[in-house]
Amino acid sequence: MTKEEKQKTLDELNSLQPLYRNAANAINTIFTTFGKLRQQKFSLWGDHTSLSTSFVPLILKEFPEAKFIFLVRDPRDVVLSYSKIEGHPAQEPIKSAKKWKNSIQTYKWLKEKHPEKVMYLRYEDLVTNTEIQLKEICSFIGMSQADLFPTPNEHEKVRDRLGTE
């Protein structure tokens, strides 16, 4: 994020009326302002970090329409990938195992309490059956594939970004 983007985002946050100064509006303002600054068109935004699994009850309180996609990858592949990144937290197996366990517990809790708000997706399935999995994701979040991929074969670009052929 550039200095100008940070300032614009702070200006937008400061412009929120006191009545609307809450976590949900602050987060929404940050995501939408950043998206607009990058000239991106979107109707949904999301967070792809595992950190958000620690805040699921708060997220549901602030964003009652929130949905969660748990993208799970074979742990052996995760360890192999992250072992190549010097200083990455995944190089500490006990910490990584605790984070993974917390994420799985959160998934199970969501599946039990709010089954309509959670989707389980294996990374390997996304890589090998990209088009099918993207259709399922679109269905889950309530978007058509045409909205998500406005040009033909756009899903192939997703597969390319996943590092597959």
Task: Specify the residue positions occupied by each region the protein language model found.
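PAPS-dependent sulfation machinery
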Residues: M1-H48
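A structural motif corresponding to the C-terminal end of an alpha-helix
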Residues: L37-Q39, T106-V118
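Short His-Asn-centered micro-motif
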Residues: D47-S50, Y123
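Conserved phosphate-donor/acceptor-positioning beta-strand/loop module used by diverse small-molecule
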Residues: H48-T49, L58-S83
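Short, well-ordered alpha-helical microsegments
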Residues: S52-P57, T130
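A glycine- and Lys/Arg-enriched "phosphate-lid" helix/loop adjacent to the NTP-binding pocket
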Residues: I69, D77-K101, D160
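The conserved 3'-phosphoadenosine-5'-phosphosulfate
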Residues: E112-E165
